[in-house]
């Protein structure tokens, strides 16, 4: 089985801060010249590629930049596919939040310079070792830069020296005098140098091409899901948009027809009531002359007209 292209990140981190278990590097891939010769020529539109996300897994942490990374990569690449699946499962199942803050800055990039071709090895199912191709190795050096607030918090949480005398949580001047009397020495410089460690992150690329045009480097969290960013908004289901709900705006119908029917019904009721009153008045009005005739002892209705 041919070994894929391997990319390595070496991050310079201040001692005492938590390392990120994985880094997500967004970049645009640049195809190598050898691959361009093998592949057929394509149009300029086909050569343009969108940004892609690459997940680098934490392999190990070393104390010095001079320490070789080949043995660490050899152990990490031996069960290549199984390791990535196991690490991904561990990252997603972990409930611990990454406390890493700040940003990562790329300071150096190298493609297989000064690394022997037989330094990187990967074993197949039978256990035989194969030398990795020297042209398929890329190393990038990064520096983790902390924010000012995070750096101040890290300094405040640093373990105190038992020889330091404090008064109301304030260090006495004696410690400052001792530091001023001691000139710069190699021991002090070595102590400052030992304040940093180097985290090694590895990615075995199955697709050809070098990592170029780095856009961003971010810590990988267990909530990070590499989904398609081109997902259409209409494909996303909204929990609140329930068509069967009574409060949904789709279920609100206009009440104009009902109001017209109510007005018609009220008008017909008024008309019928007025007709009933008129009908009741007619017999009463027709009966009125007879009542008057009887009361005043008139013989005929003409006598009422003469009066």
Curated annotation (Swiss-Prot):
Pfam families: Iwr1 (PF08574). Keywords: Cytoplasm, Nucleus, Phosphoprotein, Protein transport, Transport. Residues 233-245, 254-264 have a biased composition (Acidic residues). The keyword Zinc does not apply. It is found in: Cytoplasm; Nucleus. PANTHER family: RNA POLYMERASE II NUCLEAR LOCALIZATION PROTEIN SLC7A6OS-RELATED. This is Probable RNA polymerase II nuclear localization protein SLC7A6OS. The lineage of its organism: Eukaryota, Metazoa, Chordata, Craniata, Vertebrata.
